[in-house]
Amino acid sequence: MADPLDLFAIDKIIETAECSIEPVIASEASIVKKIDEYYKVADTVDSITLTSDEDEEFDWTEELHKEEAGEEHIQHVIRAILKQAIIEDVHEVNFEQVEEGLKVVFKKNGEPSDKGTIPAILNSAFVSKLKTLSNLDATVCEIPQLGKLCFKVENAMLIASVSSFPTIMGERISLKIYKPPKHLDKIIPDEKQRSIISHALNNPGIILVCGSPLSGKTHMIYSLLMEAATSGKNIMTIESIAKYELKGVNQCELNENVGFSMDKALRYVEFQSPEMIYLEGVKTRDAFEFLSELFYNDKTVITEFMANNMTDLRQKLAFEDFQSFKTLITCLIFIHSKDSVEVFDKETLQKYLA
């Protein structure tokens, strides 16, 4: 009650409840704190444990029937889906609107796999909770949004980008899981290849990381940035969303909602005098021309390019728009799979792409 000294109100409560009452004075902050402590559902997926022997046969749909529908139950369903994705080494999970509800689709090596459906009665609550956990506006469904979901697997903190996109059936949600970066010697054991990368990181030029979708390009790039951060250089990134915070790297997230687009970032980033820049997902001719300008200004540039294999890469770079760009690549890292990575120096690459 607002006034614990209101004797008339206290007497009325005693009479109605037939209980004795002992008034206690407390601050509003302490009351709110206790309410949150005992009643609030945490805005987190909680930790995912992978130590059980039955993990290989784990099925997230069993979580649907374990308890009554509610906010906490929805969080358990989200956690179960993420757990199954981790067990199956899946890095992309899509939630698609269908008549029966929300279809859960795992995508691995480019192949989609139907993993069941969230009943239509839970659609709204599930999408709303997933968006809230990802720092998206759950009340907005007419425009695309991009957010970030953090969750723990054993002792490692994982990040997933969460993208919502409006369709005529309702919002489609795409979730991509990114694993923490590793030191280069853990993912590229060959000393000669690491030497090529080290030389490229310490000299002006363009380091191009290639591979098929979800091949691990971002994981590799973050490992490169982590390696370069020890040099003390002014390193900057321009990304749609920062997957992990890297010590010694000035990471920048684009925000279209306030007009901070890639074009605007490219116009102003040089005022920060970066020595190394990572540009995510360069696709336009203007962006490629900007990469060339950075090279001529003695910058080291890291970017990525999608290609399914080396033949595909040669065909894509054969277009006239890429002729100048190709000559500036000082190091190419091609990711065939998580266990197969090729590294090319400038001389070898120019012969191959000629």
Where do the model's predicted regions map?
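Switch/coupling sub-region of P-loop NTPases
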Residues: 202-207, 213-214, 222-340, 344-349
